[in-house]
Swiss-Prot record:
It comes from the Bacteria. NCBIfam families: dnlj, PRK07956.1. Zn(2+) binds at C386, C389, C406, C411. The lineage of its organism: Bacteria, Bacillati, Bacillota, Clostridia, Eubacteriales. This is DNA ligase.
């Protein structure tokens, strides 16, 4: 008995560390399948011994919150759901009742409160007893109504999620994410719990309602389906659901399973709830689970295979990720041959060695993972040098998680941002080269400097092996790269990523030197500060860049691949030279404000984002607007002109008074 209780304590300690890492620190020290296995083993021991320890995860819902967001206790505790992987259990649980079967979205659960038709509060699930107030962040969710027709007090629950497509895009673009966000759920958690909701708004968070908690004086016929449809009519997106009975639940589960891969949103199973609200509520709850709902987790398809290699993939943060390469197997209809191991702690826990027989599966039927190591031959060697720069590596340990890092600050993998910037839309415009793809190309040693990007066609076979790139995508990429060979001095200058030299300043510099690249790269400090809009700091940064011998070689290698367009520019065309403009409000004669900005810059002017004492004109079609820019312009006695006045100036030379 004592041995079994000690075993329970050991399992609880491991589960507690894993849950803390996942929910508080947005990292993983074990896979979901390992966690579930340990948890089920603990439940069996508790059942066998009749002992449940006070710190067991079987009776605890969450963890203490560790952020600076305001906290608030929930009016009703938010319990987790009991779960099963057996459809027969679902059928038995439902019995003769009708039910609602819906997606179990894998994001962050949120409680929303509306009063008088307005969103007044949004709180995360948190510990289940207490959550974090994220009202300002919820206001910038992509699809959340901040005003609704219903004027009573409304409380509903739902899931904030980030779609797979946005996850891939955002994870490639956001520098501070690095390897921290392993999946859409972790990215969503970090996005929803921001102190600055500008960050939240840029992350494309969506909300899907799944439960109505309170709606005063609304008659919904004691029906969950009616509740969901009523929420939909109020403007909320709700989780897809189907009404089921014990006779059709098996085929309905099958329908959901067949539609997983078509979904752009993360899901980790299904939720079955009694359609009869009163009946469900009459059942009450256990200390941890409500009795009116149950979760269904997909039974993972596990295939045995042989571990062939562990590939170490460096990232822009210096972190070097271990990736398992194994004999290809068919999983959920696709061929899989690699899976992320995430960190050294997981690698040690699995005792992975080359040649081991391992079990692999797709987490949530999407992401390849290692479930177990059947032979456990011992740890494969951890590299002492970075695979990209051959510099020294070191193992770091934080919150009980071991990770491998390259300590060389000059490592090419850490310069990923310069490559990302170089291929960007306003620079070389090489469509198809995402940050993730560039990171893989660098990690494999296929590109070592910017000019190498123009010759990646010779690595076709290696590139086609990268996830997400097929023959068609590769051909489009090569076409885009070849198209980029013919470019402008402005694009080239901007693409070099010189500190403090943005696109508009690159245009000013190129225009000043008549687009002559030889004059541009050999510009003197005294010349640069003569250009309106170029100050001492920017000029110093420019001179420092072109004085660096290594940078000169990089630029020359790029130039050897390019054909710079000649620009013929007459002085008479520069009608906006040395003038500063600000654009606000909607435009009517141009496609958008960017098109208007381009016209101004082509004619020698500069467009800024804020009204200051240096602003000459504010372009605004609504002169009576109460916008901050309008007010500021009037305070500073700056001319406010309409598009029509601007066009009269542009086309007929009539400058507004």
């Amino acid at each position: 008995m004592a041995d079994k209780i000690q075993l329970m304590k050991d399992k609880i300690e491991i589960l507690d560390r894993a849950a803390k890492a996942y929910y508080q620190e947005n990292t993983e020290i074990m896979s979901n399948i390992e966690y579930d296995k340990l948890y089920d083993e603990l439940l069996e021991l508790e059942k066998e011994t009749g002992v449940v320890l006070s710190n067991s995860p079987s009776i605890h819902v969450g963890y203490e919150l560790l952020s600076n967001l305001p906290k608030e206790r929930h009016e009703k505790p938010m319990l987790s759901l009991d779960k099963t992987k057996d459809v027969g259990t679902l059928k038995e649980w439902l019995g003769t009742q009708k039910g609602i079967l819906s997606w179990k979205l894998d994001g962050l659960t949120i409680v929303l409160t509306y009063q008088d038709g307005h969103l007044v509060k949004a709180v995360t699930r948190g510990t289940g007893e207490e959550g974090e107030v994220i009202t300002n962040n919820a206001r910038v969710f992509r699809n959340l109504p901040v005003t609704i027709a219903y004027k009573g007090t409304l409380i509903l629950r739902g899931e904030a999620i980030i779609r797979y497509s946005d996850f891939i895009k955002i994870n490639n673009e956001i520098a501070d994410v690095g390897v921290k966000y392993k999946n859409p759920r972790n990215l969503c958690s970090g996005s929803v719990r921001q102190l600055n909701n500008k960050v939240t708004s840029e992350r494309n968070v969506y909300f899907f309602g799944f439960s109505l908690v309170k709606a005063d004086n609304v008659e919904l016929d004691n029906s969950r389906a009616s509740q969901m449809n009523w929420l939909k009519n109020q403007g909320f997106d709700i989780v897809d659901f189907k009404e089921v009975t014990s006779s059709n639940i098996e085929e309905t589960v099958q329908w959901f399973s067949q539609n997983i891969e078509a979904n752009d949103f993360p899901s980790d199973g299904l939720v079955l709830t009694f359609e009869d609200i009163a009946y469900g509520e009459s059942l009450g709850s256990t200390a941890k689970f409500p009795r009116d709902s149950i979760a269904f987790k997909w039974r993972d398809e596990i295939k045995e295979t042989t571990l062939l290699n562990i590939e170490w993939s460096p990232s822009r943060t210096g972190l070097i990720n271990p990736i398992a390469i194994f004999e290809p197997v068919e999983l959920e209809g696709t061929t899989v041959s690699r899976a992320s191991i995430h960190n050294i702690s997981i690698m040690e826990g699995l005792e992975l060695g080359i040649g081991d027989t391992i079990g692999v599966y797709k987490a949530n039927m999407i992401i390849p993972q290692i479930s177990e190591n059947l032979t456990r031959s011992g740890m494969a060697p951890i590299p002492e040098e970075c695979p990209v720069c051959k510099g020294k590596t070191e193992i770091k340990q934080e919150n009980g998680v071991k990770t491998l890092y390259c300590v060389n600050n000059e490592c090419l993998a850490k310069q990923i941002k310069s490559f990302t910037h170089f291929v960007g839309r306003d620079a070389m415009n090489m469509e198809g080269l995402s940050e993730a793809t560039l990171e893989k190309l660098i990690a494999k040693g296929l590109i070592k400097e910017l000019a190498d990007l123009f010759h990646i066609e010779k690595y076709k076979n290696e590139i086609l092996e990268l996830e997400g790139l097929g023959e068609k995508s590769f051909n489009k990429l090569i076409t885009s790269i070849n198209k980029a060979r013919k470019t402008t001095a402005v694009r080239l200058l901007y693409s070099l990523g010189i500190p403090n030299v943005g696109l508009s300043n690159a245009k000013l510099i190129c225009r000043y030197f008549k687009y002559d690249w030889n004059k541009i790269e050999n510009a003197e400090f005294s010349e640069l500060i003569q250009i309106g809009g170029i100050g001492d700091i920017m000029a110093e940064s420019f001179i420092r860049f072109f004085s660096d011998e290594k940078k000169k070689v990089i630029v020359q290698d790029v130039l050897n691949e390019l054909e710079l367009e000649e620009v013929q520019l007459s002085q008479s065309e520069q009608i906006f030279e040395n003038l500063n403009f600000v654009i606000t409000g909607s435009v009517e004669q141009f496609k958008n404000r960017d098109e208007l900005k381009d016209v101004i810059e082509e004619k020698g002017g500069k467009v800024t984002g804020a009204v200051t004492s240096k602003t000459n004109y504010l372009i605004n079609n609504d002169n009576m607007s109460n916008s901050s820019k309008n007010k500021k312009a009037k305070e500073l006695n700056i001319s406010i002109i309409t598009e029509a006045q601007f066009l009269e100036w542009l086309n007929n030379g009539v400058r507004p008074e």
